Regions:
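Secretory targeting and sorting signals
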Residues: 1-37
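N-terminal module-boundary/linker segments of secreted carbohydrate-active enzymes
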Residues: 34-84
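Ligand-recognition surfaces built from glycine- and aromatic
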Residues: 43-64, 134-140, 150-154, 225-266
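Secretory/extracellular carbohydrate-interaction modules
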Residues: 77-176, 265
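Short tryptophan-centered beta-strand motifs in secreted/extracellular beta-sheet-rich domains
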Residues: 139-141, 197-213
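Short, aromatic/His-centered strand-loop micro-motif at the edge of beta-sheets
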Residues: 178-201
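Short strand-turn-strand beta-turns centered on an Asx-Gly dipeptide
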Residues: 214-218
Length: 266
């Protein structure tokens, strides 16, 4: 067997020593990157502050209380509230992510879970309601639907609700985005080619016993609706549950990115 010369053996040991720091740097790099990402996310303000959300809202979550009903976060707690992944700031700090999984807690009048903001009085101390037959009531919502549940890929994003049911909303089914009218889910087709993550502006204007609904500034539908106790909602209202969508767990959800929402009453 050939013996290695001292010079060749020393040369190989030197190469190994030189390679070791480079290998160590390569192994540490992803950890440093992950730390930087975490630091960036931590630097984001609370969700409400990220989009300048007014105090005139409360949050309804798909998370159960001890009694099984959905959790509600009211003012002033909502100002600083963050509950990932159900209500949190996007990584670029520009929007709120609202998520509702199919196995989430639901309110008594529905079988579907929601992560939604519900309109309140200006200081958030009481629920707000108004008539469509008097005055002009407007909500502008800047949003993107970013995820759909499986099997039944339906999500509502932004709506007017009255004392008993939703009056009108934006509803995505697969790639088809609709404006609804009460129990008519396909009242008006806005687009048949909606791509998840596409940001759009929706506007609802309730006046004279009807609601005009706009998509990116263009009037798309007018819904007849004379109601006395209307209110606005913004966020993700997943139209699927464990009876019609699988798997029945938190990996199966609807999600909306909310960049801004404003409400005016005149």
């Amino acid at each position: 067997m050939e013996r290695q010369s001292p010079s060749r053996s020393s040369h190989r040991r030197a190469l190994r020593l030189l390679a070791a720091p480079a290998l160590a740097v390569g192994l540490l790099a992803p950890v440093q990157s992950a730390s930087a990402d975490s630091a960036g996310a931590a630097a984001c303000p609370a969700p409400a502050a990220a989009i300048g959300l007014s105090t005139g809202w409360k949050l309804q979550l798909p998370l159960p209380t001890s009694s099984g009903s959905p959790q509600e976060i009211k003012q002033p707690a909502l100002k600083t509230y963050n509950k990932a992944p159900w209500f949190t700031t996007t990584s670029d700090c520009k929007a709120i992510l609202l998520r509702a999984a199919v196995n989430g807690a639901t309110t008594s009048n529905t079988g579907y879970p929601r992560s939604e903001l519900r309109e309140m009085t200006a200081d958030g101390s009481a629920t707000k309601s108004w008539p469509s037959t008097s005055g002009t009531h407007t909500m502008i919502v800047d949003q993107a639907i970013t995820h759909l549940p499986k099997t039944k890929p339906h999500v509502m994003a932004g709506q007017i609700h009255d004392s008993s049911s939703d009056v009108t909303s934006f509803r995505l089914e697969g790639t088809s985005l609709y404006i609804t009218s009460y129990n008519t889910p396909h009242y008006k087709l806005v687009t048949s080619n909606y791509q998840l993550g596409t940001r759009f502006q929706g506007k609802f204007v309730a006046h004279d016993g009807k609601v005009d609904v706009y998509y990116n500034g263009a009037l798309k539908a007018t819904v007849d609706g004379a109601f006395g106790s209307g209110y606005y909602k913004a966020g993700a209202y997943t139209q699927a549950n464990c009876n019609n969508s699988s798997p029945c767990d938190t990996s199966n959800y609807g999600q909306v990115a909310l960049y801004g929402v404003t409400v005016t009453h005149k």
